[in-house]
């Protein structure tokens, strides 16, 4: 399919406002996934990176995430980035604060003054943002990186979103005229 980096939004910083039992279940599911799938990710040459805050995650989850990140660091078939306790607003504010204070983490590899994902592996700008579940909003997800992203909306809920629908989204994306602020190529 030509996808080298895939970022999925597993848990927004705003999701902490959900009922405690739901948050606990989501964190347990994520922790179980990291423990269960870490070896398979490594075997399939998939690099796993977690973006978002770690200070509010359980110590056990953070340890397991760091272990799997280290184990998969050399993966080059796919870079799977999972956003957990993630907020674009928070990331952008922290980057602005670091830039204002002159901190070294304020620099990014694109040559600009701000890195909206300090502490996270820098990824290229988003090409295609797929929103599942029938929602028509970005929900504070990769706002900086999605400045010129093509948007594709699906009524399918994430757990049921299958390869065929992903293929349709990518095929639609490939037919689009990406201008990045310029006049259409057809003009």
Residue spans for each PLM region:
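Flexible, compositionally biased loop and terminal segments
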Residues: 1-187
């Amino acid at each position: 399919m030509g996808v080298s980096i895939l970022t999925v939004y597993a848990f927004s910083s705003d999701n902490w406002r959900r009922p405690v039992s739901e948050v606990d279940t989501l964190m347990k599911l994520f922790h179980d996934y990291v423990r269960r799938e870490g070896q398979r990710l490594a075997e399939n040459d998939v690099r796993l990176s977690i973006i978002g805050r770690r200070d509010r995650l359980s110590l056990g989850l953070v340890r397991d995430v760091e272990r799997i990140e280290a184990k998969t660091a050399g993966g080059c078939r796919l870079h799977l980035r999972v956003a957990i306790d993630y907020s674009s607003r928070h990331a952008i504010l922290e980057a602005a604060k670091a830039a204002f204070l002159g901190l070294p983490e304020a620099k990014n590899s694109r040559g600009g003054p701000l890195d909206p994902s300090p502490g996270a592996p820098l990824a290229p700008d988003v090409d295609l943002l797929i929103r599942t579940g029938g929602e028509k909003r970005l929900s504070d997800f990769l706002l900086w990186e999605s400045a010129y992203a093509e948007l594709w909306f699906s009524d399918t809920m994430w757990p049921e979103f299958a390869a065929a629908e992903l293929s349709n989204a990518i095929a639609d994306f490939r037919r689009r005229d990406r201008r990045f602020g310029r006049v259409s190529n057809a003009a």
